[in-house]
Regions:
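Short coil-to-helix segment of the ABC ATPase nucleotide-binding domain corresponding to the Q-loop/switch region
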Residues: 66-73
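Conserved ABC ATPase "signature" region
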Residues: 35-36, 73, 81-97
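Catalytic Walker B motif of ABC-type/P-loop ATPase nucleotide-binding domains
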Residues: 126-129
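Conserved ABC transporter NBD signature motif
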Residues: 28-36
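Helix-to-loop junction immediately C-terminal to a conserved catalytic motif
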Residues: 20
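A short, proline-enriched helix->beta-strand linker immediately N-terminal to the Walker B motif
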Residues: 120-124
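Conserved ABC ATPase signature
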Residues: 101-111
């Protein structure tokens, strides 16, 4: 788990979009899992995004007319090697809501559906933009615990973009961004579980 920190406008979301193959580079290169994604052609980038990357954005982008289960299945239906639906719903504790619609869920529950949708396709990389930005402290801890569980249970590398310094405590590595540049990249020697964070 990596936490990418920086003030608003520092380039965190741009970095996330470049890692996910959504934005292109002006200079330099990006290598993910031995693959230089900054040199991939459009079709290869689409394949990379579909197979290797899961996205969880600030706005969950759930489809309002689909149930929780259907929102997740939309992604699993196009995935090459999706994880079992029941296993993913259990991992993020949303199985009991599977027949509900997004407007019947709390913000934290919607966030868990978004996480489930991102991980069902079994991505190598899970990119989370301001994962807890609109959530209260208790819900934030629960969502971060689910991300830890996803990392441990499925072996997914996770990058969380945030301006909240406290989240860095749960990370294996912390990257700091300022004015579009990486100003620090450190291993976290004192990693603590998400439920012990003081948010």
């Amino acid at each position: 788990i990596y936490v990418i920190l920086g003030p608003s406008g520092s380039g965190k979301s741009t970095m996330l979009n470049m890692l996910g193959g959504l934005d292109s580079l002006d200079s330099g290169s990006i290598t993910v899992d031995g693959k230089e994604i900054s040199k991939l052609k459009s079709g290869e980038l689409t394949k990379y995004r579909r197979s290797d990357v899961g996205f969880v954005f600030q706005f969950y982008n759930l489809i309002p007319d689909l149930t929780v289960k259907e929102n997740i299945q939309v992604v699993s239906d196009i995935a090459k090697e999706p994880l079992p639906l029941d296993e993913v719903m259990q991992a993020v504790d949303i199985g009991k809501y599977k027949d509900r619609f997004p407007n019947e869920l709390s913000g934290g529950q919607q966030q868990r559906v978004a996480i489930a949708r991102a991980i069902i396709k079994n991505p190598k990389l899970l990119l989370c933009d301001e994962l807890t930005g609109a959530l209260d402290s208790k819900t934030s801890k629960n969502v971060l615990k689910f991300v830890e569980k996803v990392n441990a249970q499925f072996g997914t590398t996770v990058a969380i973009i945030t301006h909240n310094e406290m989240i860095a405590g749960m990370a294996d590595g912390v990257i700091r961004i300022k004015d579009g540049k990486v100003v620090a990249n450190k291993v976290n020697e004192t990693k603590i579980p998400a439920d012990k964070l003081e948010l």
